[in-house]
UniProtKB/Swiss-Prot annotation:
Protein name: Phosphoenolpyruvate synthase
Residue ranges of the TM segments: none
Active site positions, chain numbering: 421, 751
Protein EC: 2.7.9.2
InterPro entries: ATP_grasp_subdomain_1, PEP-util_enz_mobile_dom, PEP_synth, PEP_util_AS, PEP_util_C, PEP_util_CS, Phosphohistidine_dom_sf, PPDK_AMP/ATP-bd
Residues annotated as binding substrate: 511, 578, 680, 701-704
Needed co-factor(s): Mg(2+)
Length: 792
């Protein structure tokens, strides 16, 4: 790739690959790598060219400006924000005032003429690509400039000059010093690429891994209307999608979760260049905010491209994509190694021990907890108010904020999604962040003490006061063998990918209640009879079901997503999903639920479980749950999902519920379907062999079994000290159940609280020959290791 014997000043993307990072920087080298190697595999990258590091170095050398730059940097205190700002501004002005050498200007002119030959009105993106950028140990997130909708050769030339100057942005100078890079060893390449008309469609960022947990079996995609800069900066709360890779590879529907973002604003082309700007920000019409910015087919298509890119690079990738509004085609406009998870880590578990008044909530970044006094920062001029340990509260951050972000104990923003700047840097620094809160800067007051918790799932909470929390560290690579399986109880799909990274042998209890309560929130009957509801209730439900075609589809679709997330997280290990076990008072608390539920004196012993499923008043609601399970197993192919029936009072009820399941298309044994029964009523143990005729095994619910064996209300504080699963009467019932299952060669596990709380009880169950213990995630490692010690 020589040019008249000297190093070329400009290279086309299709001449480049990853071995050219030192010539054109990580960003441009990666674009070249994809055009050269992945074009035939369905990965589309817009064409373009790059100026080389030689071109940049010659530009600085020939003008002599480099000497002045390095002298000024050597005598600047980088940690003094004022000094840094003054030096940075001076250096950037020197570069902008320096003319290009004629050879470089001509080389850019020739390449530009070729790239715009088919359309003289073509618009371009001009991006920076630093030669040290996108190395896996340094996330230069957004540290240099990007110019969009640049039209005409003169405008491209100006943009390239500004890109060169951006190597000396305050944040870039500060970052290099703190990461140990020598300023003299870093050069800049400008990439000039044809624009994808995503101003007329949507764009976003995707990762070939779950960014929060490091779980590598999903692609995580974010999307919003307009140009991608809004998502990258965190100026909008985007739509989010998770796609399961093994399901995608099997050519099945693979989207396991969709979350609609508010998408309030978008960046589009400015009709005329306003104030020298080629783009403008405008409000998104309400009807577009209320729908997803990608179709399911487009989400799957993007995920396929992400998988191809990850496979080619052999590592998790962070990818920017754009959809062309004219052609509908999806393009990849950037790909770099995903920085945070590439580092390797010790497993840390943060636990909040109490909860206070919630001041704000948004998207949780990471799984940590931080606490301290609030500092509301309205703009960058107030940066120096941040002291170490403060909770930084602001509208949104950009890379200029990095020097102070590392001082914060937590970060809270009004705007942004999980791929915004604040999120990327918070992960890198290991600081909890709650982004996209909407009005945190108004609700949180300077100086008040708060606790910021990201340890409770996808939603992050800001609580009033300093609350008590703890952190456990463990780095367990391989677990010792036991004569039983250690499984997990999981209710919240938001935490599934995180929990799947713990040592485990599947899920012994996945509860539907959390999904119905938190992801749906509406009584199933109120949805089935939507047209009969009061207008006010209809409006409330419409607001909740945005993104779904009908009330019925909202219930089935959300349940499907929740179950699929749990199934995908632990695939191919077994995931036993217990169908809904709400009591009548809990169903009544759902939106629209009051008119459909009986008022019972003791709901714990009332209308629940199997009896509810087969009753005329609930059968068609139960059918919705069955439909969701069928979609997960039959359409998506997640046949590791099994179902469990709670609170089966009589053998006749057992027979009736299994027949009802078959009527709904869930026939025992078909497509490998296993149906497990909760063994949680004394009658279940006393007549265990008869109950087992209808099921593939038992999962012991020790909470209800204890309550019913000892005649205790487990919700009553008055008798709570008598509640103990280790009571001999309870153990006698459990022994009967275990022996009966063993005799018939059927599965028997336990999913009650007992073995998580009492290691001696877990040890007794192991001696009894139980097949599995399903434990709370925070006790899995400890209980597993303790039982292994006993077996020695």
């Amino acid at each position: 790739m020589s040019n008249n014997g000297s190093s070329p000043l400009v290279l086309w993307y299709n001449q480049l690959g990853m071995n050219d990072v030192d010539r054109v920087g990580g960003k441009n080298a990666s674009l070249g790598e994809m055009i050269t190697n992945l074009s035939g595999m369905g990965v589309s990258v817009p064409n373009g060219f790059a100026t080389t590091a030689d071109a940049f170095n010659q530009f600085l050398d020939q003008s002599g400006v480099n000497q002045r730059i390095y002298e000024l940097l050597d005598k600047t205190d980088i940690d003094d924000v004022t000094q840094l700002a003054k030096a940075g501004a001076q250096i950037r002005q020197w570069i902008i005032d320096t003319p290009f050498q004629p050879e470089l200007e001509n080389a850019i002119r020739e390449a530009y003429a070729q790239l715009s030959a088919d359309d003289e009105n073509a618009s371009f993106a001009v991006r920076s690509s630093a030669t040290a950028e996108d190395m896996p140990d340094a996330s230069f997130a957004g540290q240099q400039e990007t110019f969009l909708n640049v039209q005409g050769f003169d405008a491209v030339l100006v943009a390239v000059k500004h890109v060169f100057a951006s190597l000396f942005n305050d944040r870039a100078i500060s970052y290099r010093v703190h990461q140990g890079y020598d300023h003299r060893g870093v050069a800049l390449s400008a990439g000039v690429q044809r624009m994808v008309r995503s101003d007329l469609a949507s764009s976003g960022v995707m990762f070939s891994i779950d960014t929060e947990s490091g779980f590598d079996q999903v692609v995580f995609i974010t999307s919003a209307w307009g140009l991608g800069e809004m998502v990258v900066q965190g100026a909008v709360n985007p739509d989010e999608f998770y796609v399961h890779k093994p399901t995608l590879a099997a050519n099945r529907p693979a989207i396991v979760r969709r979350t609609m973002g508010s998408k309030k604003i978008r960046m589009v082309y400015a009709p005329t260049q306003e104030h020298g700007k080629q783009v403008k920000i405008e409000d998104v019409p309400q009807e577009q905010r209320d729908i997803f910015s990608l179709t399911n087919e487009e989400v799957q298509e993007l995920a396929k491209q992400a998988v191809q890119i990850e496979k080619h690079y052999g590592r998790p990738m962070d990818i920017e994509w754009a959809k062309d509004g004219h052609t509908g085609k999806l393009f990849i406009v950037q790909a770099r190694p995903e920085t945070v998870r590439s580092r390797g880590q010790v497993m840390e578990r943060y636990t909040l021990h109490s909860q206070g008044k919630i001041i704000a909530e948004g998207r949780a970044i990471g799984h940590r907890i931080g606490a301290g006094p609030v500092k509301v920062i309205h703009d960058i001029s107030e940066m120096n108010r941040i002291e170490p340990g403060d909770v930084l509260v602001t509208d949104m951050t950009d890379p200029d904020w990095e020097p102070i972000m590392k001082k914060a104990s937590a970060i809270v923003t009004n705007r942004g999604g999980r791929t915004c700047h604040a999120a990327i840097i918070a992960r890198e620094l290991g600081i909890p962040a709650v982004v996209g809160c909407g009005d945190a800067t108004e609700r949180m007051k300077d100086g008040e003490n708060v606790t910021v918790s990201c340890a409770e799932g996808d939603t992050g909470y800001v609580y009033a006061e300093l609350l008590e929390f703890s952190v456990k560290s463990s780095s367990v690579e391989t677990m010792p063998d036991l004569p039983l399986k250690v499984m997990m109880n999981v209710g919240n799909p938001d935490r599934a990918f995180d929990f799947a990274c713990l040592p485990n042998e599947g899920v012994g209890l996945a509860r539907l209640e959390f999904i119905i309560n938190r992801m749906i929130g509406v009584h199933p009957r109120a949805l089935l009879e939507f047209d009969d509801q009061e207008p006010q209730l209809q409006n409330e439900i419409r607001e909740m079901m945005k993104g779904f075609d009908s009330p019925r589809e909202f219930y089935v679709g959300r349940l499907t997503e929740g179950i699929a997330t749990l199934g995908a997280a632990f695939y191919p290990k077994r995931v036993i999903v217990r169908l809904s076990d709400f009591k009548s008072n809990e169903y009544a608390n759902l939106v629209g639920g009051e008119r459909y539920e009986p008022d019972e004196e003791n709901p714990m012993l009332g209308f629940r479980g199997a009896g509810r499923y087969v009753s005329d008043s609930f059968r068609d609601c139960f059918a919705l749950e069955c439909e969701a399970v069928k979609r997960v197993r039959n359409d998506m192919g997640l046949t590791n999902v099994e179902i469990m029936i709670p609170f089966v009072r009589t053998v006749d009820q057992a027979k009736a519920v299994v027949e009802e399941l078959a009527r709904q298309g869930l026939k025992r044994g078909e497509n490998g379907l296993k149906i497990i029964m909760m063994c949680e009523i004394p009658s279940n143990a006393l007549l265990a062999e008869q109950f087992l005729e209808y099921f593939d095994g038992f999962s012991i619910g020790s909470n209800d079994m204890t309550q019913l064996a000892l005649g205790l209300d487990r919700d009553s504080g008055v008798v709570s000290e008598l509640f103990d699963e280790r009571n001999d009467a309870v153990k006698a019932l459990l022994s009967m159940a275990i022996r009966a299952a063993k005799k018939q060669g059927k599965y028997v596990g336990i999913c009650g609280q007992g073995p998580s709380d009492h290691e001696d009880f877990a040890a007794w169950l192991m001696e009894e020959g139980i097949d599995s213990l399903s434990l709370n995630p925070d006790t899995v490692v400890q209980t597993w290791l303790s039982l292994a010690e006993l077996k020695k």
